[in-house]
Each structure stands twice: as structure tokens, then as C-alpha cells.
Amino acid sequence: MTILGTTFGMVFYLLQVVSGESGYAQNGDFEDAELDDYSFSCYSQLEVDGPQHLLSCAFEDPDVNSTNLEFEICEGLLEVKCLNFSKLQETYFIKTKKFLLIGDSTICVKLGGKHITCQKLNIVKRVKPEAPFDVKVIYREEANEFVVTFNTSHLQKKYVKDLLHEVVYRLEKNENDWMHVNISSTKLTLLQRKLQPNAMYEIKVRSIPNTNYFEGFWSEWSPSSHFRTPENNSGKMDPVLLIISIVSFFSVALMVILACVLWKKRIKPIVWPSLPDHKKTLEQLCKKPKKNLNVSFNPESFLDCQIHKVDGIQARDEAEAFLQDTFPPQLDDSEKQRLGGGVQGLNWPSQHAVITPKTFGGESPLRCLSGSVTVCDVPVIPSSRPPDCREGGKNGPHVYQGLLLGAGTTNSTLPHLFPFQSGILTLNPAVQGQPLFTSLGSSQEEAYVTMSSFYQNQ
């Protein structure tokens, strides 16, 4: 009996020692297990395998002995109250489609069926997207740019579709000099001028939820992709740009030449019209005349010019007006036939013209200057021309022909037997009782006044 009791005592002691090393406390010895740090963190991935969601948790302290530890989630589930996690190495996870995705859930760490520590969290606020994949870089030589494209599985998902992607790239020789670009699409364009020529670059992408309801963490980095930039071709010039530059240069040169040639004749008069200088005009008007002028008002200098008095011009005009009012116009053929019997005997029998004096401005026309005589004492000038002809000449007077005064008529008007022609009878009573004859029809003997030439400024 003594040997049997000793054996049971040693076994009990060994079991107690082994249980103490594994962190398992028995008989209410739970205070020793609470001395360790069992803090943990979790994240969710929605629709990882169809409708199933994934929730993963891990201890923040990697030195924690997790051999006998378990994870349990309660609340925020469909049809069940609690679910236990599965363990894969140092990670605890659960894949199910029973997450309610509304409200908070409680996750606890259990040791021997007892809760050591618990946390409350909302699964939709701890979403960690899946890492992007299939990162490609394509060089477009025409545009001198690199097009970066990648893919993500969230494009086909129902819940977390809107993501913000962070694209980073660097030179391979610069380990920590990353360039960051945030985009909401799966396509990015990098300009060649912002990259170093003939260099190798590394690029990768990660994502994060970009909605108000779903929040969480950055995803894992995608696999890195590498690309090389081409050599610098700054010495070469595009032929199209070269042709455009040459044509533009010659066009500008041609316009400059034409502007210089046509400036004075065509362009300047239109753009800047020349205005007369008022100063020069006033100087010419106010300028004193020269001493030796060709202008002279001496009457002797006008001896070679024929000057007519203004009184003669006025007398001629009054005679024209009187004759036009006194004598009727020419008779037409019918009147000539009607008067033919009396005219045949008087058909220019002597071809003489009778000149009668006229007192201009008086009451009685064609009165004789002597007063009471039977026939006016006027000279008769022979003429061999028909009635419609006039004698020409500078000194010969122009008179009406065919005007006859019958015998026995005293201070009477001329008979209206023949029509008057273009000649006009004028009488200039310069001397009392002696009639003067003046031509009124010829343009050569029209009265004019000769004035001196005006001085022209040279």
C-alpha cells in the first residue's frame, strides 16, 4: 500500500508540473494565465469565395504561446449565436456566409473553456481588400508615355466595389525613394519626361475601401512589375515638327519682307494716313511777297488786251431781251404759204438790212433819234447773204437782214414779215444822234474782263 500511494503521488506531481508549463491552470489557478498579453487584431474579407466571407484574427505579440488558445465570435450572426475559429499556424480564421454585416460582434480568446479577453468590432469597418494582380506596363512611343494597368477581384463583387488604389514606383537602385500616385481606376499614365532615360523601374499596387459604409485597411501589395525606359532621343527631331518649323520661318520672313517693301506705298497710307501740315499752309498765306513780282496793276500793261466796258455789256443784254420780246418767232411753212402772195414781191428784193436806234431803258422801242421824220435816218448796209446767214469778222457788225421800213411810216414798229435769225440788233448811243453798231451774237466779241495772274508760291 505504501508503494502504491507513493506512485500516485509522483504521478500527480508530474501532471501538475506539466500543466503549469503549458499555461493551463487548474483548481482555480487562473491568475497566472492572466499575466500574459493576449491582445489581438482582426480583419474581414467579403465575398472571398462566392457568398462566403472571411474573418481572420492574430495575436499582436508573436511570442504568445497559442497552443491551447481558441477564438470565438458571438453576436452579429445569422441562425447561430456563436462560432469558433479555425487555426492555421499563427492565424485564426473563420469562413462563413452567416455574418449579418450589421452591428457589432464580440470576439473572445478562450483558454480551457474560459474567456481570457474579448473585443467588440464591426466587420464592415475592418475590411481588407484582396491584393491587386496582373500589373502591366506598356510603352506608347507615339505619345512618349507609359500606361500602367492592373486588375482586382473587387470589380465583380457586390459589396466592396469602390476602391482607392495606391501605385508606387521607384528606380531599382533607390530602395526607399518611392513615388506615390493615388487613383480610383485601374489605369495610370506615366509621362516619359518625368522618368529617367534608360533606367529600370519597379512598380506595385495596393487597395483600400473608398466608401462611407465599408472601411478598413490597405490590402497587401501586388507582385512587383519592372519596366525599362528608352534612351533619350533629344538629339533627334520629329520630321513633321521640322517641316512645320521651316514653313513657319519662311512665312514669317516673307511677311516681313513684304511689309518692308509695301510700307510706304500701301501699308502706311492705310494705317497712318498723312494729314496736311497747317503750319506750312499758314506760312504760305502769311508770307510776305517777294520784291520782284510779275504782278502789275499798271493800265499800260493791258494795252495789248481788248477791254470792254461794263456799260456796253449791260446795253447788249437789254437789247437781246427787247428783241426777243418784240419780234415773233419764225413762221412755219403753212404761214409762209398763207402769206406767200404778199411775200413773193418782198422776197429779199434788195437784200438790205435796216438798223434802227433804240433808247435803252425807255418806253418806246425802235424810235428815231430825230423825233418827227417820216423815215428814220439810218444807214442801209447791202448784203448778199440769205436771211439765215450773218457776216463774220472782227470789225464787221452783225445785224438782222431783211428788216424793211415801208415809206410813209413814222415812228412805227417794224412789220413782222420775216423771222429773225440768231443775229441781234444793238445800238450803243454813245453820241446823241449817231448810232453805234455792236456785235451781240459772236463769242469772239463777248465782253470779258482780264485780270492779272495770281501769284503762285513756288
UniProtKB/Swiss-Prot annotation:
What keywords is this UniProt entry annotated with?
Cell membrane, Disulfide bond, Glycoprotein, Membrane, Phosphoprotein, Receptor, Signal, Transmembrane, Transmembrane helix, Ubl conjugation
- What is its membrane topology? Single-pass type I membrane protein
Q: Where is the Fibronectin type-III domain?
A: 131-232
- Signal sequence bounds: 1-20
Q: Where is this motif: Box 1 motif?
A: 271-279
Entry comment on modification after translation: N-glycosylated IL-7Ralpha binds IL7 300-fold more tightly than the unglycosylated form. Ubiquitinated by MARCHF8; leading to lysosomal degradation.
Its subunit composition reads: The IL7 receptor is a heterodimer of IL7R and IL2RG. The TSLP receptor is a heterodimer of CRLF2 and IL7R. Interacts with CD53.
Per the record, the domain comment is: The WSXWS motif appears to be necessary for proper protein folding and thereby efficient intracellular transport and cell-surface receptor binding.
Q: What is this protein called?
A: Interleukin-7 receptor subunit alpha
Q: Which organism is it from?
A: Equus caballus (Horse)
Q: What gene codes for this chain?
A: IL7R
